[in-house]
A protein has these predicted regions:
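Basic, helix-initiating cap at the start of DNA-binding domains
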Residues: 1-47, 51-60, 76-80
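Secondary-structure edge/capping motif, primarily at the C-terminal ends of alpha-helices
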Residues: 97, 119-126, 154, 180-187
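Short, hydrophobic secondary-structure boundary micro-motifs
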Residues: 120-123, 135, 192-193, 215
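Amphipathic alpha-helical packing segments from all-alpha helical-bundle domains
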Residues: 130-156, 163-181, 194-211
Length: 219
């Protein structure tokens, strides 16, 4: 299977000289900051957070290190801003009204593909880094919480057994995160529908075994 490719590039453009009006200057500064963060995310995800210095970032971005320090105080700040931004996007998505598993998965894959390096930093790199793990825990716990609520209202037996319900919710969170990571790195975009069908059928099978007293199944 061909691996999916990212359109991100580590090279960043240089702003033209000049002193525009304050509002335009602020907008340009924000655009520049966003551009730098996207490029930094690609380098950090590829090389590893702890193995990448500010010098290495600047070199691979093709800019002087002073440019990075003009926008960010440290590499740690860059990493945390990247993680918080993708986590905020994830939280915004998950706060929407539930419209079914299929719809949710479409939105999740779209988000992860559009921000592949950032999502991998959140879902993989922060999970293995003690200092950054709280970001991963927020991602993981959001899936656990939503799954727990769905199971609680769908199954009388699981409603009364919080331990088993939490076990199921934890399993679903781990399953989905691992599946999404693997798919955005290896699955072709034009086969996303196959991923949605596979994920939906997999969860249906699990829920059927976990909730024999319920007629609810993911759609």
């Amino acid at each position: 299977m061909a691996r999916s490719t990212s359109r991100q590039t580590t090279k960043v453009t240089h702003l033209q000289k000049g002193r525009p009006p304050l509002e335009e200057a602020n907008a340009r500064r924000q655009e520049r900051s966003d551009e730098l963060l996207r490029a930094c995310a690609l380098v950090l995800e590829r090389n590893g957070v702890r193995r990448t210095s500010m010098d290495a970032l600047a070199e691979q971005l093709g800019i002087p290190k002073s440019v990075l320090y003009r926008y960010f105080g440290s590499k740690d700040e860059i990493v945390r801003v990247i993680l918080q931004r993708i986590l905020d996007l994830w939280s915004d998505l998950q706060s929407k009204r539930w419209r079914g598993l299929s719809h949710n998965l479409h939105e999740v894959i779209a988000l992860a593909r559009a921000n592949q390096s950032e999502f991998l930093l959140l879902a993989r790199h922060s999970a293995a880094d003690p200092e950054l793990r709280p970001f991963f825990e927020s991602l993981h716990s959001s899936i656990v919480s939503k799954t727990d609520k769905l199971l609680e209202i769908s199954s009388p037996s699981l409603k009364s057994d919080t331990v088993i319900r939490q076990l199921c919710s934890q399993a679903v969170a781990g399953f989905l995160i691992d599946a999404i990571i693997w798919w955005i790195e290896n699955g072709e975009n034009n086969r996303d529908d196959e991923f949605f069908q596979w994920a939906r059928q997999s969860l249906k099978t699990l829920y059927r075994e976990w909730m024999p007293d319920s007629s609810w199944r993911p759609t």
